[in-house]
A protein has these predicted regions:
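Conserved beta-strand edge residues that scaffold enzyme active sites
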Residues: 37, 121, 146-147, 171
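Short gly/pro/ser/thr-enriched loop/turn and capping motifs at secondary-structure boundaries
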Residues: 66-67, 147-148, 171-175
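His/Asp/Glu-enriched short active-site or ligand-binding loop at hydrolase and phosphoryl-transfer sites
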Residues: 137-147, 167-168
Length: 180
């Protein structure tokens, strides 16, 4: 990502830090994870498939600042009202991007554990997405810092055999678990 992320050379130190934290807090399960960005081209994530086994948990979500993800159109949709149509090609492309990401990675053995803030930053068909999450056993994030999932979208999602996780969207350790 252009502004966030980890450097792969930091992983050995992160593993050491996690081992130390596990020794100090044996009652807690502490995982090393990554929130990969979804893209419209295979492998549909911006983290290389060969790097994924280095993580204990894989999250995926759509974000601005990623190539091959419709950034300009989605930004204009969210901030100007352009492309606002129930059947817009942007909605179709965005939804296909998420479905392709979920199914292709599941088929490749790269299970996505959590889909983060679905519906945020562009038009997405939440019903189709939660069906795919149910099919793949992917948890759906309810995010404290983003506009989506909305209450209405949660009601739609709750009709399916999908599980939720609540995220604080912390980008620094001090914000972990902070909810409003």
């Amino acid at each position: 990502h252009l502004t966030y992320g980890i450097k792969m050379e930091q992983l050995p130190q992160m593993r050491k830090d996690i081992a130390a934290a596990k020794a100090k807090f044996p009652e807690m399960e502490i995982l090393l994870g990554v929130e990969a960005n979804t893209m419209r081209v295979a492998p549909y994530l911006d983290v290389a498939p060969v790097q994924l086994p280095q993580f204990d948990i894989l999250l995926a979500g759509y974000h601005y600042g990623i190539t091959h993800a419709g950034m300009a159109a989605n930004y204009l949709y969210r901030h100007t009202g352009l492309f606002h149509s129930e059947n817009s090609s942007l909605l179709v492309k965005n939804t296909a991007m998420i479905l392709d990401c979920l199914y292709a990675n599941e088929e490749a053995g790269n299970h996505i554990d959590i889909l983060t803030h679905p519906g945020d930053k562009g038009p997405f068909d939440i019903e189709d997405i939660v069906k795919a999450c149910a099919d793949t056993g992917t948890l759906v994030e309810i995010n404290d810092k983003h506009r989506h999932l909305t209450v209405d979208e949660i009601r739609v999602a709750a009709k399916y055999d999908v599980q939720f996780v609540i995220g604080s969207d912390a980008h620094v350790p001090e914000k972990v678990g902070s909810f409003e």
